[in-house]
Amino acid sequence: KAGAMIGSGGLVVMDDKTCMVEVARFFMNFTQNESCGKCVPCREGTKRMLAILERIVNGEGEDGDIEMLLELADTISATALCGLGKTAAFPVVSTIKSFRDEYEAHIYQKRCPAGACQKLKQIYIVPELCKGCSKCSRICPVTAISGKVKEPFVIDQSKCIKCGACIESCPFHAIKEA
């Protein structure tokens, strides 16, 4: 439905659990690896675009990143010497055009609407549902969950590695992922 250009000669079907920013990062990584490196726009431009996309999917995106990606895309497309370089930025431009709101959510709200970007996931305990059984705390491999028995536990987001072990262990379904 979106009509986003991802590549040439192929059809890619995705659902709402697919992060379009990650898709753009994946294709830019592929392009960067396939670049022969002979022309500066392709070699350096795709490297810079990939670095920006990696920052965005890791929750470190900044104001101006979308505009910088579009500017780099225009420059690379106009100045690259080969077909790969001239089309390298198409997936990024297409995903920004059709899914700009996803880029903005990653950059400004530090969240992935598809829930696919690991670094942007939040695992939390709903205090009203937590019975304080401590099962989650005992199973956490990095001791990110603390609390007192029979009282709601809490997750230290700075320690949490988002493995999901606590979610599976909770018999009261008090641990959620956002």
Q: Language model features by range: what are they?
A:
Residues 1-122:
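Redox cofactor-anchoring modules in respiratory/redox and cofactor-processing assemblies
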Residues 11-12, 149, 166:
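Compositionally biased, intrinsically disordered low-complexity regions
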Residues 24, 73, 88, 95, ...:
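Small-side-chain structural scaffolding
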Residues 27-30, 111-132, 143-162, 173-178:
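Ferredoxin-like iron-sulfur electron-transfer modules
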Residues 36-42, 82, 130-136, 140, ...:
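Short cysteine clusters
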Residues 43-49, 89, 137-143, 147, ...:
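Cys/His-rich zinc-coordinating "finger/knuckle" motifs
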